[in-house]
């Protein structure tokens, strides 16, 4: 609302990952990343959805009549987990103080996962659109929350202009895969809500490969 008062003409992109750093969602995000089964991942995503939807509703209401571009989750997944160097220190201490504890076993498991996620070139690694492809249900959840918020705001008379940015696309097939499934989610939500809203999907050319 403050941005509108200062003359903002819309939201160029919403960094949706900031919502995941919120204490309301942090535990569910970690469980989603660490899930061993799709069922466990879906349970975590179900907890994250209403938090995203609530935040999106606030954005649409504040930007009444102006475009709101939602950038789907962008950073590497390990950024939502404890830092590697902190885990190393904690594991080292626990091996001395609590060598046979469940706490040590949990920390060692987390350290193994975080180590496995380390990448030499994260910009082209498992993040952005590729995380959306590999973590089944993640970007579908975000898209559902976004269009549920848009439809429900529209029912209350808010003039919504939703747009979706698929991040870090390096190859046209990445865009095709994500766009196809997310457009289907948007259409499904509009059918469920009984209201039509604009549904624009695109990307930002932000890596050299995409430009070439």
Regions found by a protein language model. Give the residues of each.
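Conserved alpha/beta-domain cores
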Residues: 1-212
């Amino acid at each position: 609302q403050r941005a509108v008062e200062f003359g903002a003409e819309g939201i160029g992109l919403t960094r949706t990952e900031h919502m995941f750093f919120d204490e309301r969602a942090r535990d569910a995000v970690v469980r989603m990343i660490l899930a061993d089964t799709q069922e466990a991942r879906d349970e975590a995503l179900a907890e994250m959805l209403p938090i995203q939807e609530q935040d999106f509703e606030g954005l649409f209401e504040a930007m009444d009549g102006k475009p709101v571009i939602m950038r789907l989750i962008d950073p590497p997944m390990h950024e939502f987990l404890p830092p590697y160097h902190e885990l190393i220190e904690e594991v080292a201490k626990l091996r001395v103080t609590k060598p046979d504890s469940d706490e040590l076993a949990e920390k060692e498991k987390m350290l193994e996962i975080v180590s496995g996620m380390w990448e030499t070139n994260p910009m082209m690694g498992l993040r952005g659109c590729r995380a959306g492809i590999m973590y089944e249900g993640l970007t579908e959840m975000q898209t559902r929350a976004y269009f549920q918020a848009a439809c429900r705001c529209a029912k209350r008379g808010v003039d919504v202009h939703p747009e979706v940015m698929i991040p870090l696309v390096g190859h046209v097939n990445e865009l095709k895969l994500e766009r196809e499934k997310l457009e289907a989610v948007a259409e499904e939500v509009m059918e469920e809500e009984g209201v039509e809203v604009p549904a624009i999907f695109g990307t930002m050319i932000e890596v050299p490969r995409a430009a070439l």
